[in-house]
A protein has these predicted regions:
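Acidic, surface-exposed loops and disordered segments
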Residues: 1-312
């Protein structure tokens, strides 16, 4: 736009009505995208001025960002995270039974706090409770099925053109025809089956045949961090999404692999139990698994032409 502004708009057609009926997770994902935009703007020498939910009557516009010219007010902590954006991936692989240094845990906690959220690493009985809640949610999903999951797990084809036909990238006649990438969870990123350990890795391949998929032992004492906020409204979800992405980018920069454990978050009767009743924190927005291991595979993303509209 001529006024150097960017509107972040939600695509409600891509929501998950069964796992995310309030669209809380959708807001978290958009918050993460907003943080990446802020990092990219800082890297390019602009200061992003952000307003969350700028129009109360427009639920689709989640944020407006105005790019201000370079000045002394640039946040020099954000720009170095730019190179971590393409490297941050979800790893569904085993992590080493190796502690995360306390100094690094404290650094990640500080990153969440700087974005207006809080983060806590789980230990002792609280870690065991959260693992049990996630396992219960996973068992329920195995029994009940997951209609949303079926929409987003990609088996076989990972690329298609705009007609939905399979495309072999090596045989494209027009190098400008990039086709349309099917985003989601492709088969090659599912990771191995877990035959031991307690790492809360979601098995997206349940009920599907994957003969070449190996089984491996996962960590027995996973490192889990909770992202939580004081309240539980759309603006809080956007704040938490930015905090989540900042934590993940810094973790990636520091050599940590990561994944999400959302199973219990998708069941209201279990989500409220995730919080620690002793320190009485606010609602949990995300459970993050961190550790030392493979970063995971690169996965397709929505085509830029399908997600970005430039207005005069």
């Amino acid at each position: 736009r001529a006024d150097h502004s960017i509107a972040l708009r939600a695509d409600f057609e891509r929501s998950m009505p069964h796992a995310d009926p309030q669209m809380r997770a959708l807001h978290l994902g958009c918050g993460a995208a907003l943080f990446n935009l802020r990092v990219a703007a800082q890297h390019a020498g602009f200061r992003p001025s952000v307003k969350l939910l700028p129009d109360p009557d427009d639920q689709q516009t989640l944020a407006s960002v105005t790019l201000v010219g370079a000045s002394e007010s640039l946040d020099h902590d954000l720009s170095p995270l730019y190179s971590a954006i393409p490297e941050r991936r979800t790893s569904r692989y085993p992590f080493a039974e190796r502690p995360i240094p306390t100094a690094l845990e404290n650094l990640l906690v500080d990153q969440a706090r700087s974005e207006g959220s809080r983060m806590a690493f789980l230990t002792g009985w609280h870690l065991q409770l959260v693992l049990e809640l996630i396992e219960e949610a996973e068992l329920n999903t195995e029994h009940d099925g997951d209609q949303d999951e079926e929409l987003w797990v990609r088996t076989g084809v990972t690329l298609s053109d705009t007609t939905g036909n399979p495309v072999d990238p090596a045989k494209r006649e027009d190098p400008e025809d990039l086709g349309m990438i099917l985003d989601g969870v492709p088969e090659y990123s599912l990771g191995p089956r877990r035959y031991g350990g307690r790492a809360p890795v979601r098995d997206f391949a349940r009920g599907r045949e994957h003969s070449e998929r190996d089984s491996e032992m996962f960590e027995h004492m996973p490192h889990l961090g909770l992202i939580y906020t004081e309240h539980d409204h759309p603006v809080d979800w956007l704040v938490a999404g930015q905090a989540m992405e900042r934590v993940l980018l810094v973790a990636t920069r520091e050599g940590l692999a990561s994944s999400f454990a959302t199973q219990a978050l998708e069941r209201p009767e279990l989500r409220w139990l995730l919080r620690d009743p002793v320190w009485g924190a606010g609602p949990v927005q995300m459970v993050i698994r961190l550790g030392y291991g493979p970063l995971g595979s690169r996965t397709p993303r929505r085509d830029v032409r399908d997600a970005l509209e430039i207005l005069p």
